[in-house]
Amino acid sequence: MTAIDLLQPAEVFPTWPRAQRELDVFAREVPPAPHVLRTTGLLTPARAERITDWFLGADAAPDGDTRRAYRALARETAHVFAVATQCLGVRVRIAQEEPYESAAELCAELREHGTMTLVREATHPLLSPDELDRLRVVHDVFGHAALGLGFDLQSEYATWLQCRTLFSAQARPAAFCELVGAVTAYVGTGEKPGLRAKLPPAALL
């Protein structure tokens, strides 16, 4: 597994205070302080390895618990997406090719113009394309742009620790799979894994 060399997020740029304020209003619990998330490496190499092993482990057909978690995730994401589009005025475009060379470009566009562009992913086992798009918008707006953090692994984990507060206990395991499992496995192996729908053991949440 690729070592996690940095003890803090590597890509740090200006925050988006308006998005942070909306998150603070709609969060189900108090998130960690933005200063802590922006300056502290909270994902240990051992934990990253456990996440990767879990995500890439044997994959079974989604059971009832998994389906219920993903239904909750889709419902709650739709609500938070409405906060992004109605309260913050975020406008989303769909493109065929990746429009950004860096996280800094994405976050600057959101912060300065309230717009962002998505390239749709492959088919997901349980989420529709629109549901998956909404989750990515929520993650980018209330995670990356609000905190001013990039796509390195410590930054991704910090955005998770912020965004997890937007979801209920039922939806949170599914959100973890989508927002932590895939990117951690990608960084750990150097190969982009396929989309999966599975729930992590409680010790990883």
Regions found by a protein language model. Give the residues of each.
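Polybasic, proline/glycine-rich intrinsically disordered low-complexity segments
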Residues: 168-205
